[in-house]
A protein has these predicted regions:
Chain B
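Secretory/organelle targeting and membrane-embedding segments
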Residues: 1-166, 170-513
């Protein structure tokens, strides 16, 4: 990808272009003399991408996330193949109104790094963190040599979206290797997995029905309808179901060209059926459990869907989980 | 058949999830149900945290259909729901709402309620837990509890539980609280009794324990060696609007606020670290604080340590206000206090010699509840003698409402050649740092009651010991031959001069909120 693919209007939205060596001074000036703004920060949130077409949407995403999670936001667009090498930076305040008069603001520093290497990315990130605050990185690119030990050993939370990976099998291997490194101590939050949260919650609700619960052992099949490009989410969901049931149900995946990432989940067996369905444009999901003559229906809120909302949701969950890592070998085997 | 665990529940939640449950609200046509309880349950549903196959039954005297009841509640929800009102969600949620008409003293009505609950269980395919919420007037608690017992509804079906949630006021003195506790104990075990105090459901109240016990910098200083005194203020800028004078004039600030809400805050500030976070470990430590309060016995001790007052005509925010005795539904000869300030001592090693000043009042200049912990001054401050430093001790302020947060006042050097020292404030605001709105106190407390976590509910001994302490003061005020004076303050001021004198006598003053 070359620098020429950079869109001037996208760059213009990043705020005030500032020489990298003067970022701290420029940030200070940004706040000086404006008593109506309160600066707040609880985390460092960095987005790393190698796709210049994502610059505008990532910029919007940070604006959305910062409204709920006060942060020092870093947006890094790395274009390793681009020549000649050049590094540019922009600063801006992400503000939201507070009590009518004041604005609560987070800082965003954006970088476009052309022709740089892994060390340059690390230096840039580590030089501009708000000290003592946790570092959350959403690594949007593939886990290549830029994602290396000296970098991930400093990360507290790594956000990925495995459904974006062009070669999921290879990327899952790279992820597992990083997670098993001696110095790695980061939580992994996979947005592909987060997207299934509402389905999992609804499924739990489905089988809270006493009659259906008694028939769990009779379940035989899983049928998941998902949006094209969200196969990993469907696979992760299927692995989770099999793990929970300690079995291996027959899996059928149905791909659709439009609609929500996950559209329906049906578990079926002799005399028992649990269905979770989310219709297009609905913020709710329909849950239906049938067991012989007995039928139970419910309406539950659907989880958020956009990347910004998913990231925001993840930042609200500070507890890590070993569940995801325990599923990786199974997902990896299904990708063979 | 042994009960199966739902394998899909595990791994999903960071908190204990409630199992299928029916909530029965007694006094369902009242203000609390419309303004707080149903909007709280609706918001729990909107967050997806409501247990599956949930039902709520409104129990009251008036004749209504399910549909009529739902329509009334919908109106209340539109006005009061924290997350707004969604017609689609309400449409589904409303199906779980039912109405049951009965007199509180009519056993047949309770038997019919039992049949309705059984019918729900049949529809569910299994028995569910039952939570009885007493939102009726306190005088109705006794007949309701007796009828619940007589109808056999106080026992869960199979291995399911039956619990009761009691709204405040829990008694009006020690004798009535004990009487009520006895009735409750005849019907429900203490572990199934949840006495609600909505202050404990507030995010900042819950944060007091986290602040104290998760931060190593505070706890070593949290004692009489480093803390000079503690102030707890609960100010309201309203009077007796909306007809509340009728109830309030029978209670007063001491019974209405201090015995429950402010004592709960006091115990959270003063308690020893619990051995764990189980409900009883936390409540064991809280009750020790109440027991250690130095009793104020007799009019002299009460007069010296407690200031009561009524407001006279004045203005708040530029709006004229009548005096307390001129308020709607207030006795013109009333001896009830809408303001009280107390100096309390806690006789423990940790708090020896550290006064806790509490004040609560109506028609004060602003609405605010906060705790301020005033640290001792260093033995010597060699820098400056400015009058600006008169009240320059480090102060940790925990704002309960509004603008929830924590502030720490410290001293810093002013820029310049001279060694001038200036107070600065490090301020943490929940709303600035966490964009998401906190759940309403009732949402948290209802979910806790459904999930069986009693940590944020008052235990019997807590309530009775608090009343025991309060009764001595009430006795000195109303039953002694030489009762302490009822002072006055103009509406819109920070209370009577005598409340200021209470601290001034100790060389201190109230924090300016």
């Amino acid at each position: 990808m070359s620098a020429s693919t950079l869109n001037d209007s996208d760059l213009g939205r990043l705020g005030l272009e500032t020489p990298i060596s003067r970022i701290d001074r420029a940030l200070k000036q940004l706040w000086e003399g404006d008593e109506a703004k309160t600066r707040a920060s609880l985390i460092n949130l960095a987005i790393y991408t190698e796709d210049s077409s994502l610059l505008a949407s990532d910029n919007d995403l940070l604006d959305h996330v910062a409204a709920e999670h006060a942060c020092r936001a870093l947006l890094i667009l790395a274009l390793p193949e681009s020549q000649p090498p050049r590094a540019r930076a922009w600063i801006q305040a992400l503000c939201r109104p507070y009590q009518g008069k004041q604005a609560v603001c987070s800082e965003q520093i954006s970088f476009v790094l052309e022709g740089g290497d892994a060390a340059q990315v690390q230096n840039i990130v580590f030089a501009h963190l708000d000290s003592d605050l946790p570092l959350v990185v959403w690594w949007q690119a593939d886990l290549t040599q830029h994602f290396e030990e000296r970098f991930y050993s400093r990360i507290d939370t790594l956000i990925i979206d495995s459904s974006r990976w062009s070669d999921p099998a290879k990327q899952f291997d790279a992820l597992r290797e990083a997670m098993s490194a001696e110095t790695a101590d980061f939580d992994v939050r996979d947005l592909a997995w987060t997207r299934s949260h509402f389905m999992r919650t609804a499924l739990a609700s489905c089988f809270q029905d006493a009659a259906a619960l008694q028939k769990l052992a009779a379940l035989k099949t899983i049928r998941i309808t998902h949006l094209k490009g969200r196969r990993t989410t469907a696979l992760l969901l299927a692995v989770w179901i099999n793990q929970r049931l300690k079995t291996s149900l027959q899996l059928e995946l149905i791909e659709k060209d439009s609609g929500p990432a996950l559209q329906s989940l049906v578990l079926e067996g002799d005399g028992v059926r649990g269905e979770v369905r989310r219709d297009c444009d609905s913020s709710f999901i329909n849950v239906c459990t049938s067991c012989g003559q007995h039928e139970h229906k419910d309406l539950l809120p659907a989880d958020v869907d956009s990347d910004a909302e998913l990231v925001s949701e993840q930042l609200s969950r500070f507890h890590g989980s070993t569940l995801y890592s325990s599923m990786l070998p199974f997902v990896r085997s299904m990708l063979k | 058949m042994p009960e199966l665990e739902n394998p899909f529940q595990e791994t999903l939640l960071s908190r204990h999830r409630a199992e299928p449950c029916t909530v029965v609200i007694f006094g369902a046509t009242g203000d609390l149900t419309h303004r707080k309880l149903i909007p709280a349950i609706y918001n729990i549903a909107a967050c997806g945290d409501l247990p599956p196959q949930f039902k709520v039954v409104g129990f009251a005297r008036r004749d209504k259909t399910d549909e009529g009841f739902r329509t009334e509640l919908e109106e209340g929800n539109r006005k009061n729901s924290r997350q707004g009102h969604n017609d689609e969600l309400w449409g589904s949620f409303a199906q779980c709402i039912h109405y049951h008409r009965s007199e509180f003293e009519d056993l047949e009505g309770y038997k019919a309620l039992g049949c309705l609950l059984d019918q729900f269980d049949v529809e569910r395919g299994a028995p569910a837990n039952r939570l009885f919420y007493l939102a009726a007037a306190p005088e109705a608690f006794k007949p309701i509890l007796e009828m619940i017992r007589a109808a056999g509804l106080n026992k869960g079906v199979g291995d399911k539980w039956a619990r009761v949630v009691c709204e405040k006021p829990f008694g009006k003195d020690l004798a009535t609280a004990r009487g009520l506790n006895a009735v409750v104990a005849d019907t429900f075990a203490e572990k199934d009794t949840y006495r609600i105090d909505h202050y404990l459901g507030k995010e900042t109240a819950q944060n007091i324990m986290v602040l104290r016990f998760a931060n190593s910098i505070f706890e070593p200083n949290w004692n009489s060696r480093y803390i000079d005194h503690v102030q707890i203020t609960c100010a309201e800028n309203l009077g007796m609007e909306g007809g509340r004078g009728g109830y309030y004039d029978t209670a007063g600030a001491l019974r209405d606020m201090v015995q429950n809400h402010l004592f709960q805050l006091l115990t959270l500030v003063a308690m020893e670290p619990p051995t764990d976070l189980s409900a009883d470990s936390v409540r064991d430590e809280k009750v020790k604080v109440i027991r250690a309060l130095r009793p104020l016995v007799g009019p002299e001790a009460v007069g010296k340590n407690v200031i009561r007052a009524q407001y006279t005509a004045g203005s708040v925010d530029g709006v004229s206000r009548v005096g307390y005795r001129q308020e709607d539904r207030v006795n013109p000869e009333s001896k009830t206090e809408p303001f009280v300030a107390l100096r309390l001592m806690i006789d423990t090693w940790r708090w020896q010699g550290v006064p806790f000043y509490i004040r609560v009042g109506k028609q004060l200049p602003k609405k605010a509840t906060e705790i301020s912990v005033h640290f001792k001054k260093p033995p010597q401050v060699p820098f400056a003698t400015s009058t600006m430093l008169r009240n320059s001790e480090n102060t940790l302020v925990i704002r309960i409402q509004p603008d929830e947060g924590i502030a720490l006042r410290i001293l810093c050097k002013q820029p310049g050649q001279a060694q001038n020292v200036q107070q600065v404030k490090m301020d943490f605001r929940y709303s600035s740092s966490f964009g998401k709105a906190s759940p309403e106190a009732y949402e948290r407390l209802l979910l806790d009651a459904m999930a069986g976590d009693a940590t944020l509910f008052a235990r019997r001994d807590e309530v009775e010991n608090a009343w025991k302490f309060i009764d001595e003061i009430e006795h000195a005020w109303h039953k002694s031959d030489n009762p302490p004076t009822m002072h006055e303050y103009p509406a819109g001021s920070w209370g009577p001069k005598e409340a200021d004198d209470l601290l001034r006598a100790d060389g201190r003053e109230w924090r300016l909120l």
